[in-house]
Design a protein with these regions (language model features):
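Short, conserved phosphate-binding/catalytic loop or strand-edge motifs used
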Residues: 16-26
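N-terminal capping/interface segment
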Residues: 21, 33-34
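Aspartate-rich (DDxxD/NDxxD/DxxxD) Mg2+/diphosphate-binding motifs
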Residues: 29
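Active-site-adjacent structural elements in enzyme catalytic domains
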Residues: 1-7
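Surface-exposed helix-capping loop/turn segments at secondary-structure junctions
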Residues: 8-11, 54-56
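Divalent metal-dependent hydrolysis catalytic cores, especially in the metallo-beta-lactamase
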Residues: 9-15, 180-184
């Protein structure tokens, strides 16, 4: 892999989002497929290939993009799938990668209200629609708890509106750590 030859040791890929909405501006041309099994198969091969070259993969954008038509760079965006549909799609892909030893994921600024409601039936609207990067329900209860992921969690770009529109940055950074993020992408505070 050329990246290894120039000293790159971490890749923000594979993009394991499932393209279920052709109007999605983020992943409509960046993901493997609309098909869950093909997405998993190609992602596993990508992961195997770059790990053989000494590069750690970070699958993204947990909990999954490709459902809504909004761009998290500019707006809030949820993943509207039911818990059962999420388990059969994004849950299947991430679970397969975790079983194969995926070392890291990139958390997206994407809400997953069905799972928040699963963990807290009395969740407030704010909790239901909190992006994964700021949601303990998604990163701690789902990712680390139910899915048993024990790798590194990096945020998607921390200046994207999907994250910054939720609270002041001075509150957002500790909230992301408390939710379960280990590292920030584009941490550019003075």
């Amino acid at each position: 892999v050329e990246a290894s030859a120039i000293g790159c040791n971490w890749s923000f890929a594979p993009i394991v989002d499932i393209n279920r909405n052709w109007r999605n501006p983020i992943i409509s041309t960046r993901t493997w497929s609309q098909d869950v099994e093909q997405t998993l198969e190609l992602s596993l091969e990508y992961m195997r290939g770059i790990m053989e070259s000494g590069i750690a993969p970070a699958a993204k954008h947990f909990p999954g993009d490709g459902i809504d038509e909004r761009d998290q760079h500019l707006s809030f965006a949820p993943n509207w799938l039911s818990k059962e549909d999420w388990d059969a799609t994004f849950g299947r892909v991430y679970g397969g990668l975790f079983e194969a030893g995926l070392p890291s994921i990139m958390a997206g600024h994407i809400a997953l209200p069905s799972y928040v409601k699963h963990f807290n039936p009395e969740a407030t609207t704010e909790e239901l629609y909190m992006p994964a990067t700021l949601s303990k329900y998604i990163l701690t209860d789902l990712l680390r708890g139910e899915m048993k992921f024990n790798g590194l969690v990096v945020t998607d770009a921390s200046h994207m509106v999907g994250m910054t529109n939720r609270m002041k940055r001075k509150d957002m950074l500790p909230a992301a750590i408390n939710a379960g993020c280990d590292m920030f992408l584009f941490f550019n505070d003075p």
